[in-house]
C-alpha cells in the first residue's frame, strides 16, 4: 500500500513572501489537493540572526490572500516551529554521537578560515579536514581536554562516508547522483549555540511529520545528498524529492533578482497595488508548469483538477511582468463590478475621489485595469486640469475637418436636455454629426475624444462624456475651437 500523500511548505520567517517561495507553496498545495493529501505549514526559525519580527504572520497572511489553505500549521498544531523542537533534535544528535556516526568538533572559525586559505592557495577545493586525523585515542582525549579547558564550545559533525553514492529519482529532473566525497567533508549538524543546522533539522522534521514528497526549488539540489546522509545514518526511508527549475527574468534571462526593479517580486506588493488574488494564483501556477493546450486562464479548482507533476518543466520559468499584467487585466475585465469597486475604493478614497460617481468611474475603466491602484491616474480627467496634448494628438487636431466636427458636436450637446443627457443618447448625436458632415471613422471619433478627454485612446466615448458632464464636455470642446 502506498504512503499517504503529505507535503509541506516550510518558510523561514525572515521577511516578505517572495514570488519564488509562493510558487513552492502553491505547487505543494496543488499537488496535495489534486491527490487528496495533506498540506502542512512548518516554520523553520532556527536562524535567529535573520529572524524578522512578524515574519511568520506575514507569510501566512499572504498565503491566505493568494487563496492557499492548509491542513496543519503552527496555528493548530504544537511544535510546528523548529525553535519548539530543539529537544527532539537533541535526541537524535545524542543517538548519532552514541553510535559513532557523528562527533564533537572543536576546531575554531579562525582555524577553518586558515585551512580554507591554504587549500585555495594550493588550488584545492575547500573542504573540512577531520581534526582528529592521525591521532591516537590518547592524543584525541588530550586534544579534547585542552580545547574544553580553553572554553571552546564544540559543534557536532556528521561522519561522512566519502565513498558513498547518494542518488534519487527526482520528480522533475529524473535520476540524480552525488558522490559522498563531493560534499566538503564531515559537515556540521549542530551549531555551537545548540541549534541544529538546516540540513539536519529538515530531515528530522520531514520524518516526524511523515512527509511523503518534498517539492522545492532546484537551489536545494545540493542540500539533498546531505539530507540523504542523515536519512541513511538514522535508518529512515527518504521522501520523494522534486526540484523545480529557477525563475528567471524574461528580459535578462538571468535568475530573478531583487535588483530587478521592473518586476513585482513579493506577494505583499500585489496586495498593496490591488491585484486580484485569483489572477496572481493563476499566473504563479504557470511558472514552471502547464496543463497543455493553449488556454491560460484557470480557476483554482481547475488548476487543482489539472495539476500533473509529470508536466513540471525542466527549463527555467520566465517571469514576465507584462504577462502578469495581461492576465490580471483578463480577470478584471470579467470580474463582478462590486468586487472591482471594493478593490478600487481605498485608492479613490486616499486620492479624495470617492464621489457619487465613483462606482460609475470604476465601471468605465474596469476593462483597462490590471491593478486597482491604476484607477487613480485613469480618472485624472475627472479631477485634474486638462492634460497637455502630445505631438501626435496635436497632429490629429490640426486636420482641416476638425473644427467642423467639433462645432457640430458641441451644438448637439448644447441642444440636449439634462434629462436626455445619458450614454445611450450621446452616441446617436455623434452619428448625427457623421450624417450631417459626411465625416466618419477616425476623422470623426478621434477629434471628439481628444477634445473631450485629452487622449487618443480610452474607454467608451459616450460613457466618458456622460461622467464628465454636459457642461464640462462642452467647455473642453469650446477650448479646442
UniProtKB/Swiss-Prot annotation:
In which broad location class does this protein mainly occur, judging by the first location in its UniProt entry?
cytoplasm
Motif 'HIGH' region, chain ranges: 11-21
EC number(s) in its UniProt entry?
6.1.1.17
Q: Where in the cell is it found?
A: Cytoplasm
Write down the InterPro entries for this protein, in alphabetical order. Answer: aa-tRNA-synth_I_cd-bd, aa-tRNA-synth_I_codon-bd_sub2, aa-tRNA-synth_I_CS, aa_tRNA-synth_I_cd-bd_sf, Glu-tRNA-ligase_bac/mito, Glu/Gln-tRNA-synth, Glu/Gln-tRNA-synth_Ib_cat-dom, GluQ/Sye
The enzyme's first-digit EC class, named in words, is ligase
Q: Which domain of life is it from?
A: Bacteria
Q: Which GO terms describe its biological process?
A: glutamyl-tRNA aminoacylation
Name under which the protein is recorded: Glutamate--tRNA ligase
